[in-house]
Amino acid sequence: MIWTDVPTPWGMRFQDAATPNAEGMHELYDHMMYYLALMLGLVSYMLYVMMKDYKNNTFAYKYIKHGQTLEIMWTMFPAVMLLLMAFPSFMLLYLCDEVLTPAMTVKVVGLQWYWKYEYSDFVSETGETVEYESYVMPEDMLEEGQLRLLDTDTSMVVPVDTHVRFMVTANDVLHCFTMPSLGIKVDACPGRLNQVSALMQRTGVYYGQCSELCGVNHGLMPIKTECVPIGDFVEWLGEQENVYVA
């Protein structure tokens, strides 16, 4: 199966979901589009009937003072439609904010104009946490198959089927940590920690970008996340200078 985990030229749809939160967002969008199409069809039909009857009817509508039944209908019907869209939306919003029993935590720090990742659950023999910085790959250093303005020199590596909590903050100005395939979009604010969680259900490479205007090089802050099997993640940890689990 081919997955769309990166932006495509002239793409007019969502990237494929890799987490339950992202799947819920896609389903909510589909349901809302159905309700909106239903309302558009009904309103268009009413306008068509009104214009057609008004043209052929010599009776002056200015003598019609009110229509209680009609007024109730055009008040209650939109209200019901709004409730049908609001309840699933609020449920998904609160579910996305819930962070319960994460298996591991990754701290994400936004800086002008790069990202820094800290794995606070894993420390080296010297007591230092695993941390590194991620910069956009210069165009003259891109290899075949790499993406312009999306690939980075280092990736954030996380294990598959693992509840990961992201603690997001910034060191200078406002940034925004955004991963469309994971259903993540959280502000990175200086002096404040925002948290969001993700359960990636399949391996792959996912891309995102800073979504908050943060300066002249705002467009040069890509995010590259590699979701790997747990065995590969442990092997990657072993390459990070004698790391053990805290």
Swiss-Prot record:
InterPro entries: CcO_II, CcO_II-like_C, CcO_II_C, Copper_CuA, Cupredoxin, Cyt_c_oxidase_su2, Cyt_c_oxidase_su2_TM_dom, Cyt_c_oxidase_su2_TM_sf. Pfam families: COX2, COX2_TM. NCBIfam families: CoxB. Its EC number is 7.1.1.9. The keyword Lipoprotein does not apply. Its cofactor is Cu cation. The chain crosses the membrane at residues 31-51, 72-92. It is found in: Mitochondrion inner membrane. It catalyses: 4 Fe(II)-[cytochrome c] + O2 + 8 H(+)(in) = 4 Fe(III)-[cytochrome c] + 2 H2O + 4 H(+)(out). The gene is COX2. Changing V106I: In strain: CBS 789 and CLIB 381. This is Cytochrome c oxidase subunit 2. PROSITE patterns: COX2, COX2_CUA, COX2_TM. Changing M179I: In strain: CBS 789 and CLIB 381. It comes from Debaryomyces hansenii (strain ATCC 36239 / CBS 767 / BCRC 21394 / JCM 1990 / NBRC 0083 / IGC 2968) (Yeast).
